[in-house]
Amino acid sequence: MLAKKYTGKKLVDNIFTISRKAKEAIANHGKANVVNATIGSLYNEDEKLAVYSVVEEVYRTLPPEDLYAYSTNVIGEDDYLAEVEKTLLGNDYKESMKGLYISSIATPGGTGAISNTIKNYLNAGEKVLLPNWMWGTYKNIVLENEGVVETYELFNSNGGFNLEDFKNKINEISKTQESLIVIINEPSHNPTGCRMTYEEWKDVYTFIKGLKINLILIRDVAYFEYDDRTEEEKNKIRALILDLPANILIMYAFSLSKSLSIYGMRVGAQIAVSSSEKVIQEFKDALSFSCRVTWSNVSKGGMKLFAKIMTTPELKERFLKEKNEYMKLLMNRANLLMTEADHVTLKYFPYKSGFFVTIPIGPNVDKVIDDLQAKNIFVIKFNDGIRIGICSVPTYKIVGLAKRIKDSIDKF
């Protein structure tokens, strides 16, 4: 009975499967004796979900009409979308980006933003260019929309962004396609925590501005709140898009799941930036149509929560202060893991910020994972490496973790 395009499709979710094993181990051996590095949410040192006190306080004081009513607009609340744009593009973006057309739509999380973009800009049978180290759901979104997955090597031999392979893949696909969707997940890349430099971004934008095809660049910025770039550094990168040609569309995928630690509320946004008024009008027309027929509208409570915090100076200050403490916690955990990894010569991908550190293993990755599970250490497999969720592992459990991983690798 299934439609042909859905026949044979089945969700295989490695993350939830391993997480279930970790929970079983905790039930059998006690939480103190298990390292559960599978969780992709921010946890405190007591291994409980990190909840911002200001978020909890504001949410519980929202009026009922903001919590339980439909959104006043299919594309999202006006005050929410205005604050999303300021957060991503800078408070003065209307002045600094005067020559560009910008529009945004509320989505159910960052997943909704990416899915809604690919649905509307991908033709069946076309390739979508993804990084070879990536969040696996990207692939499923492409496949659901009858696309073909192509990957570029994320890292070069020096651990930097592999511009050469990125360019080669785009040039090759350009020979057979008039339009191409590309995803760059940065900063705080999932699963590696890597971050591109200003120079790397400059090289990317210089290259794509010279393309003849239509290029839709999805900037997955789900974890950007946990990046420690200064506002000056962010503005330098933002300025690189000021002279976009009309055939380039930048699409930011934003998520409140990470920004406010409200994963279950499913609130995000997609922000389109173009030098073409026509391109942005197409975005408004087509994507609002997709919103209405797919999820109708997004949680009004989550949107009002973000807008209230961001537009109230005292609340925003409290939020930023709490966020900085969590950023310090993440960096302390990451630095501890990397320092101990260096001591035992355990390789890892270059981490700058975010929730995860990834260790390349090689062909024995499955054996290593099994051996770690025998030690009650649970990690997530990515390609031929393992992802460590430093976001959820308390600092005391990170002590000695690098050596235990290295010992498992050295067995095979």
Q: Language-model features: where?
A:
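PLP-dependent enzyme catalytic core of the Aspartate aminotransferase-like
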Residues: L2-A3, V12, K86, G90-M97, ...
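N-terminal small-domain helix-loop-helix segment of the aminotransferase-like
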Residues: L11-P108, F412
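Short beta-strand
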Residues: V34-N36, N73, A253, K347-K352, ...
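Conserved PLP-binding catalytic core of the aspartate aminotransferase-like
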Residues: N44-E45, F319-L372
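Conserved core of the PLP fold type I
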Residues: D66-I213, F224-L244
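Conserved core segment of the aminotransferase class I/II
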Residues: E83, L242-N324
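Short Gly/Ser/Thr- and Asp/Glu-enriched loop/turn motifs at secondary-structure junctions
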Residues: G99-Y101, P350-F356, K381-I386
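Generic enzyme active-site microenvironment
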Residues: I218
